[in-house]
């Protein structure tokens, strides 16, 4: 490519299109979407824009990609190994010089970062016709003035004499010292320039001292810590940005050799040598070399003393060689200008001196352009003939004097340009609730955006400034359904990065990757990986600035993760931990340790503590220290965001949706309506617990595989709803369709506008129906809800008690676990509380679907769906409290033939049958854990009947229950044994009279040798379905079987279990606690405590 010109003439549309086509090809290739419909659609849009306007607008992600790539292509930069770590401030919306000045002050503050320099670029509007350019007239944002003296000498920096003269003619009145910071001279939209003095507190200056020469400080040398180039043209995709400022950090020789010792700069070399006692009359004694070394020693020493980032020329050279190797491997070349790359000192003993380099030019790029004062078309009298009036300078200088940079004026301006992306994945809606709360908190100081992982464009992740992840874990370590794709995409990025960009083997990782991750993650704790922290990693460093240890696709992303889960499960918060680890492995910088929120204990308090802490760290990381803004955010944390004045029920202006449509919108699921065909109890009349069989007929075709789940939408019990309705106010007719509305505030050019907006999820529905079908009134209220209830109490003692529960985590958890109260029970406990129905509806969580394993086969039970459901009832308060009824199990038990039930299918790909019928199966499922296995044996029978010649492998079923009266599907199992569909059936009884107490894992241990043979020699698949405690006991027992009969060490056993999961031969379908007897509840709390302790770093 030809040497780039100065770019003084605007480009014609044809040239713009040629460059745009090339750039878009690079961009879409970088996100692995080259030649896709998205690429073609974007190219079409660009062509249309150019045809209409002669130019086009880059998207934000294209701009960020281009800015980083231009640094990567910069042939004269030795520090390009850091090219992906560039913070881009998109200021294309700025149209005034005062706006430009504000943005550049923000840039200086962010990049200086109290000495921990961060690379950044600020970009202003692009060139259009060449007559409305935006320009920064300074060659660097920070530089020292140079005053020509009558005797021909220069006071200050001789390099800037011409520009200093220009500033003086514009009206600048400096103190005229050797270290005056030049004002910023800015022009917007082709208009004449204005100048602005940079607040001195923004400029970090390093006063030079020497580690051994005390006299060095008497020279009063100093230099600014931030090298921010501001006079170059950014050329990207045919678009030219004539006004931009970008910075890295200093290499010591730039100051020590060039700025201090060049003869046309400060030229202090001879003075230094004389102070050293060297003879400066002859070059033979190498006095220049000796003095030059000591000046550079002083520069490095001084920066280190001030904890300011700098890199020495040896380290920089070595990092460039590494970068060169990387680029040759990844891009088959690296443009490099040898003359500029080789340091001005000790050249031949650096590796770059001996490195052959090829100089060629790539786009996007940063190019030189003529100084603005040489090309500007003045609209008023030229400054060389007289002073022009200063229109805005004095006004803005008044503002700068009136408020410090840490004020709202500057702090909030910076915050609007720093994006904080909050991602969530959820099954129950809790993570979504927390994510939105986090969005509100961060919205006080950042441009906060909240997305579900399933809706997030993964190609944007490399360009995020701040990423906050809030995610739950489904089952025993799996991602929520709307987080699966995100996790897989992260795996794909990591795989591509490890294999190499040009690898043709790159493909989407399968969901079984999560199974392996679930195993690997057990060996991971939040404290294991090195915590990358910009606040500490580069301070005073001469080597870390070019370290490549933390490089990766996400090396410019700062992140923090809050993981939700239940410590009743062994793989506590597994998916959140997995995402946290993946982000680190991809080069992301964790600004806060992973935090976990336990459903069993103090989840709300853990979230609020983490949210407050991560907000403070994020503000510190991005230099947002506006005290008022921080206080506003802290006030928002842990308080009721809504009030009785901002929520209301109103008559709707349109007809209510059908119940089916309303449920689909509320839960964002596609439901199928089913008719109940049969509902029968599976146990004998003497059985102490009820388990029912439900036969459903879908009203439309559904597709599923054995092992999948259904999500059932249940109703709250009528007596609970009636009790609640009797205690609420602000609604007269509970059966009138109403719309829940929230008062929204919008900032417009006309001021603050308030309007009532419909709730985003709750439909137009009667209040009775909302509390029956849409809102969760059985889960113990959150501390936020208790805080609101306290405000509605007329009795002061009740108000005091509720406030204690809302603010004391220990008291809340003890109360919650002992009473486990429904909302009506809470209102009974505090009878003077009278909440508003509207605010109560807004604060309550949605009533979530309950999941059940499918007990049928699509081959054996066409157009039918079977469920096996344990009916849950229990007493709270150690068995002495009121009877509680499981919401969904009792709802299903009460359904009669002909009743309608709404459900949806949730795929469980990790619990499907192997395709090969000859593969042996080991099935372990006590109680309702037998549910999916009934579908399995019916499915196997249907397959065997249709493929008579196929050899089928053995199927062993281990079932457990309390007594023989609870032996579910006993007759079906006996028939399957007779037909050879089941090979062996084992029964474990834990409460049968005159029979030794046994559990399924103990029965399995008794035939451990055979199980070992099936797994090792026959390739059997091992399935476990049941509660989390049983599943963990089975897992541990299987490890013991393998160790004993395989004569393995503990490490070999661990590796074997990892292998089973990696090969997708160990399958778990695990659910939480369904029985809340005192015995079970006490055991679950103790198990949860152990799992929490085990998961801590």
Curated annotation (Swiss-Prot):
Domain of life: Eukaryota
InterPro entries, A to Z: CysJ-like_FAD-binding (IPR003097), FAD-bd_FR_type (IPR017927), Flavdoxin-like (IPR001094), Flavodoxin/NO_synth (IPR008254), Flavoprot_Pyr_Nucl_cyt_Rdtase (IPR001709), Flavoprotein-like_sf (IPR029039), FNR_nucleotide-bd (IPR039261), NADPH_Cyt_P450_Rdtase_alpha (IPR023173)
GO BP terms in the entry: nitric oxide biosynthetic process
Binding annotation for L-arginine: 140, 249-250, 254, 259
Residues the record lists as binding heme b: 77, 368
GO function terms (MF aspect): calmodulin binding; flavin adenine dinucleotide binding; FMN binding; heme binding; metal ion binding; NADP binding; nitric-oxide synthase activity
Cofactor annotation: heme b; FAD; FMN
Catalyzed reactions: 2 L-arginine + 3 NADPH + 4 O2 + H(+) = 2 L-citrulline + 2 nitric oxide + 3 NADP(+) + 4 H2O
CDD domains tied to this protein: NOS_oxygenase_euk
Residue positions binding FMN: 426-430, 561-592
Family per similarity comment: Belongs to the NOS family.
Entry function: Produces nitric oxide (NO) which is a messenger molecule with diverse functions throughout the body.
The name this protein goes by in its record: Nitric oxide synthase-like protein
């Amino acid at each position: 490519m030809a040497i780039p010109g100065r770019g003084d003439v605007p480009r014609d549309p044809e040239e713009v299109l040629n460059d745009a086509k090339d750039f878009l090809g690079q961009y879409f290739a970088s996100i692995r979407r080259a030649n896709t419909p998205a690429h073609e659609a974007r190219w079409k849009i660009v062509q249309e824009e150019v045809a209409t306007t002669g130019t086009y607008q880059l998207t934000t992600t294209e701009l960020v990609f281009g800015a980083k790539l231009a640094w990567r292509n910069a042939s004269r930069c030795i520090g390009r190994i850091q090219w992906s770590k560039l913070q881009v401030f998109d200021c294309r919306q700025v149209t005034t010089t005062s706006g430009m000045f504000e943005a550049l002050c923000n840039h200086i503050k962010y990049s200086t970062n109290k000495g921990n320099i961060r690379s950044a670029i600020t970009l202003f509007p692009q060139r259009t016709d060449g007559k409305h350019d935006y320009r920064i007239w300074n060659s660097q944002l920070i530089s020292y003035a140079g005053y020509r003296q009558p005797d021909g000498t220069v006071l200050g920096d001789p390099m800037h004499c011409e520009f200093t003269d220009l500033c003086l003619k514009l009206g600048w009145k400096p103190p005229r010292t050797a270290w005056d910071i030049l004002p910023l001279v800015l022009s917007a939209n082709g208009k004449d320039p204005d100048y602005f003095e940079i607040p001195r507190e923004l400029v970090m200056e390093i006063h030079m001292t020497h580690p051994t020469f005390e006299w060095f400080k008497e020279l009063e040398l100093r230099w600014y810590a931030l090298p921010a180039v501001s006079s170059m043209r950014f050329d990207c995709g045919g678009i030219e940005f004539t006004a931009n400022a970008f910075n890295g950090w200093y290499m010591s020789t730039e100051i020590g050799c060039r700025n201090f010792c060049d003869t046309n700069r400060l030229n202090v070399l001879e003075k230094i040598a004389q102070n050293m006692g060297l003879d400066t009359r002859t070059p033979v004694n190498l006095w220049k070399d000796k003095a030059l070394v000591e000046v550079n020693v002083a520069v490095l020493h001084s920066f280190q003393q001030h904890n300011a980032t700098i890199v020495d020329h040896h380290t920089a050279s070595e990092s460039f060689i590494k970068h060169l190797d990387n680029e040759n491997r990844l891009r088959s070349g690296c443009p490099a200008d040898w003359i500029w790359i080789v340091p001005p000192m000790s050249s031949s003993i650096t590796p770059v001196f001996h490195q052959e380099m090829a100089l060629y030019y790539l786009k996007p790029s940063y190019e030189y352009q003529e100084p603005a004062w040489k090309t500007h078309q003045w609209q008023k009298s030229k400054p060389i003939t007289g002073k022009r009036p200063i229109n805005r300078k004095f006004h803005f200088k008044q503002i700068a004097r009136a408020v410090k940079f840490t004020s709202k004026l500057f702090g909030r301006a910076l915050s609007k340009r720093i994006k904080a992306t909050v991602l969530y994945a959820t099954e129950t809606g809790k993570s979504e609730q927390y994510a939105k709360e986090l969005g509100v908190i961060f919205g006080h100081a950042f441009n906060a955006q909240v997305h579900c992982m399933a809706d997030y464009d993964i190609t944007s992740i490399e360009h995020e400034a701040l990423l906050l992840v809030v995610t739950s874990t489904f089952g025993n370590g799996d991602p929520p359904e709307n987080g699966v794709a995100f996790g897989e995409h992260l795996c794909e990025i990591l795989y591509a990065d490890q294999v190499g960009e040009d690898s043709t083997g790159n493909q989407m990782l399968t969901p079984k990757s999560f199974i392996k991750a679930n195993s690997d993650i057990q060996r991971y704790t939040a404290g294991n990986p090195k915590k990358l922290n910009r606040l500490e990693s580069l301070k005073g460093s001469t080597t870390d600035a070019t370290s490549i240890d933390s490089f990766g696709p996400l090396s410019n992303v700062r992140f923090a993760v809050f993981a939700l889960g239940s410590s009743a499960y062994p793989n506590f918060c597994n998916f959140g931990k997995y995402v946290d680890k993946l982000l680190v492995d991809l080069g992301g910088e964790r600004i806060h340790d992973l935090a976990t929120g336990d459903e069993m204990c103090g989840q709300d308090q853990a979230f609020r503590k983490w949210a407050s802490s991560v907000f403070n760290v994020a503000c510190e990381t991005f230099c947002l220290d506006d005290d008022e803004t921080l206080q506003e955010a802290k006030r928002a944390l842990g308080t009721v965001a809504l009030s009785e004045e901002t929520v209301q029920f109103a008559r709707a202006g349109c007809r209510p949706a059908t119940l089916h449509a309303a449920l689909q919108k509320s839960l964002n699921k596609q439901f199928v309506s089913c008719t109940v065909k049969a509902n029968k109890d599976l146990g004998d009349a003497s059985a102490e617990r009820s388990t029912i069989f439900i036969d459903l007929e879908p009203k439309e075709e559904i597709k599923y595989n054995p092992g999948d789940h259904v999500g059932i939408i249940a109703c709250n019990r009528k007596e609970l709803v009636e009790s609640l309705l009797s205690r609420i106010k602000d609604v007269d007719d509970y059966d009138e369709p109403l719309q829940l509305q929230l008062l929204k505030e919008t900032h417009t050019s006309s001021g603050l506008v308030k309007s009532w907006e419909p709730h985003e999820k709750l439909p137009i529905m009667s209040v009775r129906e909302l509390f029956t079908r849409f809102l969760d009134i059985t889960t113990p209220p959150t501390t936020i809800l208790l805080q609101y209830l306290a405000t509605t109490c007329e009795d002061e003692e009740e108000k005091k008690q509720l406030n204690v529960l809302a603010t004391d985590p220990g008291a809340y958890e003890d109360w919650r676990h002992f009473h486990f109260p429904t909302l009506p029970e809470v209102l009974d406990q505090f009878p003077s509380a009278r909440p508003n129905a509207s605010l109560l509806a807004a604060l309550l969580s949605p009533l979530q679907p309950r999941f059940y394993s499918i007990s049928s086969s699509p081959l054996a039970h066409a157009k039918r769906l079977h469920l096996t459901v344990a009916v849950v009832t229990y007493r709270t308060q150690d068995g002495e409290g009121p009877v509680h009824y499981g919401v969904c199990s009792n709802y299903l038990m009460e359904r009669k033939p002909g009743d309608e039930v709404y459900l949806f299918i949730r795929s469980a790909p990790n619990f499907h049958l192997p395709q090969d019928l000859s593969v042996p199966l080991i099935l372990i499922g006590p109680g309702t854990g037998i549910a999916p296995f009934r579908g399995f044996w019916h499915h196997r029978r249907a397959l065997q009947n249709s493929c008579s010649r196929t050899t089928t492998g053995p199927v062993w079923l281990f079932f457990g229950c309390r007594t023989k009266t609870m032996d579910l599907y006993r007759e079906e199992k006996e028939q399957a044994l007779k037909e050879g569909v089941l090979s062996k059936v084992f029964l474990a009884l834990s409460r049968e009279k005159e029979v030794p107490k046994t559990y399924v894992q103990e029965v399995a241990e008794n035939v451990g040798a055979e199980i070992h043979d099936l797994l090792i020699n026959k390739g059997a698949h091992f399935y476990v379905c049941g509660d989390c405690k049983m599943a963990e006991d089975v897992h541990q027992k299987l490890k013991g079987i393998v160790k004993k009969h395989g004569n393995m060490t503990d490490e070999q056993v661990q590796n074997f279990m990892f292998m089973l999961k990696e090969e997708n031969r160990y399958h778990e379908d695990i659910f939480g606690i369904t029985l809340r007897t005192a015995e079970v509840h006490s055991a679950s709390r103790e198990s949860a405590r152990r799992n929490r302790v085990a998961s801590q770093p």
